A protein has these predicted regions:
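Structural signal for hydrophobic packing residues in well-ordered secondary-structure cores
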Residues: 4, 8, 45, 94, ...
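Buried hydrophobic packing segments
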Residues: 4, 84-91, 194-198
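Hydrophobic anchor at the start of a short beta-strand
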Residues: 11-12, 101, 206
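Midchain, well-structured core segments that form catalytic/ion-binding scaffolds
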Residues: 59-61, 65-70, 109-212
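A non-catalytic alpha/beta surface segment that caps or lines the substrate-entry region
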Residues: 1-33
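Active-site metal-coordination/substrate-binding segment of hydrolases
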Residues: 29-111, 117, 125-126, 166
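Conserved active-site and cofactor/substrate-binding residues in soluble primary-metabolism enzymes
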Residues: 11-16, 32, 81-85, 113, ...
Length: 212
């Protein structure tokens, strides 16, 4: 918000803390269609095993080897920091000739898609370009969606079985991957793998109880 003010750009913030910045057209390009560029500001905050990291208070330690930016022990935030950086570049570069530009920086994309509730008045452009695609130099003409559901189950508590052995099962070292572009790669999912193992034990006649 303050960055836009310093650059003399019109800026608004809605009740979801989303930032909307407008840059007027270059002289002679006033009648060129308006393009809206959108990127999201939130990120997935994870860290490597053994790393102490509080994303609300600890800064990201960026490693720059001259070619690639990575983070030291944590996620970098390139999703969608790259898109945010692209928007800021377009807004601050006065050497580019362009029509009217609007940049929308949204919040809570990773776990809620709350930006669907943005005021439609901010979407009055001719083109909308989402800067959250996977590959530089390519465009994806499509849309994505998601669904949420709640599941509840009333647990029936039992006393521990006397004389049984206690085991801890953990799955780690998996390849992971993006649930969108990596869902077809056949990588193992830890939750599914544990559930499959428990089902196989039950089918094999192994009696067990699960506790937390």
């Amino acid at each position: 918000f303050q960055w836009a003010k310093r650059h003399g750009l019109a800026v608004e913030k809605d009740n979801m803390n989303e930032i909307i910045i407008d840059k007027p057209a270059s002289p002679g390009c006033e009648n060129v269609p308006r393009v809206i560029f959108q990127a999201h500001m939130d990120m997935v905050c994870v860290c490597e095993e053994g790393v102490t990291y509080d994303p609300m208070n600890d800064p990201i330690k960026v490693i720059n080897d001259g070619v690639t930016l990575t983070a030291d022990g944590t996620s970098l935030g390139a999703d969608d920091g790259i898109g945010v950086a692209m928007c800021l570049y377009l807004l601050q570069d006065d050497t580019l000739r362009h029509g009217p530009i609007r940049a929308i920086f949204t919040t809570n994309e990773e776990d809620g898609m709350d930006s669907m509730d943005i005021d439609p008045k901010y979407l009055d452009g001719d083109y909308l370009v989402n800067l959250d695609w996977e590959t530089l130099g390519s465009l994806c003409n499509s849309c994505a969606g998601g669904d949420f559901f709640n599941y509840s189950h009333k647990a029936e508590w039992e006393k521990p079985i006397v004389g049984c052995k206690t085991l801890t099962i953990s799955f780690s070292g998996l390849l992971g991957g993006h649930s969108g572009v990596g869902i077809n790669k056949g990588h193992a999912n830890a939750l599914v793998s544990i559930a499959t193992l428990l089902a196989m034990l039950r089918q094999g006649g192994v009696s067990y109880c699960v506790f937390s």
